[in-house]
Amino acid sequence: MRRVALKIAYIGSNFHGYQRQPNYRTVEGELLRVFKETNIIEDTWTAHYSVAGRTDKGVHSTGNVISFITDEDIHINQLNGLLPDDIKIIGEARVPYGFKVRFPLTRTYTYIQPISPFEKKNLDITKMHVAMESFIGKHNFRNFSKRNEKNPNRKIIDVNLEVDEDVLIFTIVGESFLWNMVRKMVTSIMEVGYGKLDINDINELLKPKELRQFIRLQPAPANGLILSDMEYKNIKFKDSEYAKNKLVEFLKKEYMLHEQEKKADCRLIKILKK
C-alpha cells in the first residue's frame, strides 16, 4: 500500500461542482467511477481519499490535487482514456503516508474577466492596481465570504493583474481561501476600476467592525475562475504532457463554438445600432 497524489485538470462548465452529489454530474463523481472500475479505490473511507479544493459549479482547474492510498499501479493514460474529455489527470506524485492534501503551502487562483468594448474607456487600471495592494498580507476577509466564518483571517501573498487586449487576467496567491473569497475580491477590484467603489472602501471592508456589512459584494461569475496551482513542501509532480495536450484539443473545439456565438452577438449589436 502506498499514498499517491494526482493533479487534476477539468473544465467546470458542464459540472455541478467538484464534490459528488446524487443526480448531478460532478468532477468527483466521474473520477471515483473510473477509480472503482479499475480497482484503484474500492471505497473512499478505506483509501483515505481526500481533495485539496472542492470547487463550485462552473469553476475550472489546472491544479486541483487529490490523494489516496492504493496497492494498484497508477497508469495515467489508461485512466484518462476512461474519463470524459473535460477531465484529465495531468500529474502524479508519490507522497508520504501522512501527506495532507488539504494543506498546501500556497494556492493560486486565476480569474479571467472580459472587458466590455462598450465600457473599456471607463475602466481605471491604475486605481485597480492600488486597490489590489490593499489585499496583500493577513486580513479579516469576513466581508468577502459568508458572515458566519469561524476564522475569517487569511493571508494573501500576491495579487497580479495582466491586461490582454479585451481581457483582464487576475492571479491571486494565498495560503488558503474562504468560500467565494476570490470572486468577491475580483468584484471589489472591478468596482474600484469603474468608480463604483473607492480604494478606502476596500480598506474598510478588510476591517469589519460589526456583523452588518455596509457594502454587499456579489461574487464574480464562477465560469471565470480557475484553481490553477497548489504548492506543497518537498512534493514534485511528474506531469503528463500527453494528458495536457488532450485537454487542449478539447478546449480548442469549445473555443471555436463560443467564438462563433460571440462574433454573431457583436454583429447583431452593430446591426441593431444602425
From Swiss-Prot:
This is tRNA pseudouridine synthase A. The gene is truA. GO terms for biological process: tRNA pseudouridine synthesis. Pfam families: PseudoU_synth_1 (PF01416). Belongs to the tRNA pseudouridine synthase TruA family. It catalyses: uridine(38/39/40) in tRNA = pseudouridine(38/39/40) in tRNA. Its EC number is 5.4.99.12. Keywords: Isomerase, tRNA processing.
